Structures are given as structure tokens and as C-alpha cells.
Amino acid sequence: MNYLLFCLFFAFSVAAPVTVTRFVDASPTGYDWRADWVKGFPIDSSCNATQYNQLSTGLQEAQLLAEHARDHTLRFGSKSPFFRKYFGNETASAEVVGHFDNVVGADKSSILFLCDDLDDKCKNDGWAGYWRGSNHSDQTIICDLSFVTRRYLTQLCSSGYTVSKSKTNIFWAGDLLHRFWHLKSIGQLVIEHYADTYEEVLELAQENSTYAVRNSNSLIYYALDVYAYDVTIPGEGCNGDGTSYKKSDFSSFEDSDSGSDSGASSTASSSHQHTDSNPSATTDANSHCHTHADGEVHC
């Protein structure tokens, strides 16, 4: 009898259906706030295969550079001697973090990088690319010159490059950061050109930290400097101005009055001009090159 009961129990247990509880992530309405969120920079089909390969790598490296600058700032804040050097001693780190985070994570579905010279400007001497203007505020043309002159982040600190003595646009990453901040959806009409050269950038940090955190080249020099120091040659970098840091330099600092903004607004606005090379430019994308204080024309 016991044997018969055992057989019946076994047969029932094998045949019994298994109930599985399944958790569904999607909301009942079908709404997904992450849908169509584009974090990478779109490239137009006008770029051929080799152009696409170079530009896509450059765009990825620019985001990598921005990501590290953001993370360095989150890790150390104003305790970082690099942060104080480029943005002053009395500056909150939140805005700097935000500018770099926009490059990393903001939606880029409206942005487009193209290789067709739609406005016939790549023929101009020295033009490696250009922003198309306010009527195409999220479009950037990359000219042929970029593809034969730009370097990659793996080459940082090589071939005589130093942060303080070399141009910021030698590398795809540095050049593209500059171009990103011209885009309305990334720069948000906040980031401008108040200081250009390394020396001017350091001066701006001490005279007007409010402008420094919104100065294109301050952000780019900072990103290159901390990447070189943290990643390329850890603990050493390749600044080139003879400055070295100890571990303790990242843990504390003495307050200084030199970070004050007092009386600096007029200096920054008058001494660091951002002008188009074509004064008759209109909003429908005439020349958007600009001449830096050292005479360099950036396109």
C-alpha cells in the first residue's frame, strides 16, 4: 500500500505544472524614459570608411578625455592642484563636472558630424573644420586637413608634446572638445573664449574664476593635463612647465585671496577677444573661424 502511494505521489509531482514569477520592467503605459537616448556623437554618411574610422575614434577619445576630467574632479574637487590651477582656489566644482558630463552623457540625437563641405569653406587656408552656424547649431563639418594632422590620445606626451607648450588641437580629443562646446546642445551657449594661451588661462583662473569655468581652453587644458598625469604617465604627466606634485597636494590646500573675482569681469571681456575671421558673417553659417590671442585661427 505504501509503495502504491509513493508511486502515485511521484507521478503527480512530475506532471504538476511549474509556476514561475516573472517581473516585467516595462511600465504598463509603455513609457521608457531612456528610449532614443543617444550618447555617442552621430556621424553622417558623407564620411567615407577611412574618414569614419578616424573620426569615430576621435569622438570616442574626446568623450574619454571628458569622462576622465569629470571623474578627476568628482574624486578630488577643489583639492586637486590641477583644478585650482585652471579654475581658482574658491571655485565650486559642480559646474566643471557638468560641462564634462554633458559631453559624456547628454542626448546627442540632434547632433551631426559631416565630411561634406556644405558651405564651401574647407578650401580656406588652415581650415580643419567648422561649426555651421546658428541656423545649423548642432552640425559640424570636418575638413580633410583634420584627417592628416590630428593625433590620438595614445600619443599624448610623445614626440615632444607638452601641455603647456603645445597647442590644444594637436589631438582629435582636444580639438573635438572645442567643437563640442560650440554646439548648442552641449555648450548650451555658456562656454565661450575668454582666454586662449596657457599663460592667459592660468591668469584668468586667478583673476576671474567665474569666467574660467566657462572658458573653452581652460576646460581643454585641464582635461589634457589631468589625463596626462593620471593615465598617460601616472604621477608625472607632461605639463612641461617644471611643476611637480606630491600625494599630499591632492588632500588639502590653503585658502587664498587670489581666487577672487573682484574687478576681473572687465579685464576678461576686454583682453580676450573672440572674433570671427569674417566680420560680415551672418547667422546662416558664414565664417565661424575665430582668431585667438596668439594669432592662431581656429576653424
Swiss-Prot record:
Keywords recorded for this protein, A-Z: Glycoprotein, Secreted, Signal, Virulence
Main location (coarse class): secreted
UniProt subcellular location? Secreted
Induction info reads: Differentially expressed in response to changes in the pH with aximal expression at neutral pH and no expression detected below pH 6.0. Expression is controlled by RIM101. Expression is also increased during adhesion onto human epithelia.
Gene3D superfamilies in alphabetical order: Collagenase (Catalytic Domain) (3.40.390.10)
What family is this?
Belongs to the ZPS1 family.
Sugar-modified residues: 48, 89, 135, 208
Q: Which organism is it from?
A: Candida albicans (strain SC5314 / ATCC MYA-2876) (Yeast)
Chain residue ranges for the region called Disordered: 253-299
Modification(s) after translation: N- and O-glycosylated. The N- and 0-glycosidically linked carbohydrates represent 18 to 20 percent and 3 to 4 percent, respectively, of the molecular mass of PRA1. 0-linked sugar residues may be involved in the interaction with fibrinogen. Contributes highly to the carbohydrate component of the matrix. Treatment with tunicamycin impairs glycosylation.
GO BP terms in the entry: adhesion of symbiont to host; adhesion of symbiont to host via host extracellular matrix; iron acquisition from host; leukocyte cell-cell adhesion; negative regulation of complement activation; symbiont-mediated evasion of host immune response; symbiont-mediated perturbation of host T-cell mediated immune response; symbiont-mediated suppression of host complement activation
Its name, as the record gives it, is: pH-regulated antigen PRA1
Q: Which domain of life is it from?
A: Eukaryota
